[in-house]
Every structure is written in structure tokens, then in C-alpha cells.
Amino acid sequence: MKTTDKVLIGIVIGIVLLIVVALIVTLAQPEPAYQTEDTPEGVTYNYLLALQREEYERAYGYLSPTIKGYPASAEKFIEHIHVYSWNFRLDTDTTLSVESVKISGSNATVTVRESRFRGGDLFDSSQSTMVFDTELHLEDSEWKIIYSHYYFASCWVREKGCK
């Protein structure tokens, strides 16, 4: 066997090994799990995870009923998610992580980092990252979401709600 053939075989074996390792690492990652609901960051994380898993009734339970335009039912909440889908950003592959929490009395602000991935060619990951805030209020010893810059219908904060 020629030296160039051995080098080529070595390169091919190396590439195959890299692909196998990448697959193992990807498949071995655990599924995200719900967190405890006694902290603002836990409630925010659970709300976003429930939306990603399309467990809309659970996500609805994290909203504060004191929101001016609070959806009257889980069915209305689901309808709003579909009507205002651009603000819920559920059509792309996203990773969400809690960055920080600021608590002031019965109010809290949770800062969330969103990384969005779009399909591209081999050398273009098309990844974008942004940070947004979610506002919570402590009601009857439970943290409830009262506003979020994303994953929230802005009409919920209006007196008349969504139409």
C-alpha cells in the first residue's frame, strides 16, 4: 500500500470517528427538566420550557391573573399563541437559559438568553443570540409572570386584552 493511500485512509477514519463522537455527545445530552416553582427563575424557566414542549395549559398557569388582558381560559391562551406566533418564536430551534435574577420585595426581573439556530450551509451556523427580561410578581406565595419582552402577547397588558 502506498503512503498516500495510508494517509487518505487515516483521514477518512478520523472524519468517521469525529462524526461518531459528535453523534454520541448530541444523543447523550439529557432532556431539559422542569425546575422548582418557588423561585422567579424556576417559574420563568418552566414557563418557557412548557411553551417549547407545547404544554400550553401548564404554561398558562404561570401567568398572573392580575394582567389587564389576562386570557380568560387556557383555550384563549393557546389561540393567542398561534395568532401572535411571531412573539412566541416557536418556529425556530432555540435554546433558552436564565442569565440573572433581580428580586426587589414582591417583584422580580429574570433575564433570559435566547440562542436561535437556523439551517445553513456547512460553514454558516446562522446562530443569533439575544437577551430579554421577564417580569414576575409574588402573589399568594407564588411567583407569577406579569410581562415578558418575548414569549408573551403584548396585548395582554392592555385593558381590553387581545381581540
Where are these predicted regions, by residue range?
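Alpha-helix initiation/capping motif
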Residues: 2-4, 55, 66, 89, ...
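Soluble non-cytosolic domains of exported or imported proteins
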Residues: 34, 38, 42, 50-57, ...
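Short solvent-exposed beta->alpha transition segments
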Residues: 46, 57-118
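Intrinsic-disorder-associated interaction segments
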Residues: 1, 70, 94, 125, ...
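Exposed beta-sheet edge and beta->alpha loop/turn motif
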Residues: 100-163
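Broad hydrophobic/π-residue packing in well-ordered secondary structure
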Residues: 47-51, 60, 76, 134-138, ...
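Short, low-complexity N-terminal intrinsically disordered segments enriched in polar/charged residues
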Residues: 2-53, 61
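Mixed-charge, polar/low-complexity N-terminal
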Residues: 24, 30-32, 36-38, 42-43, ...
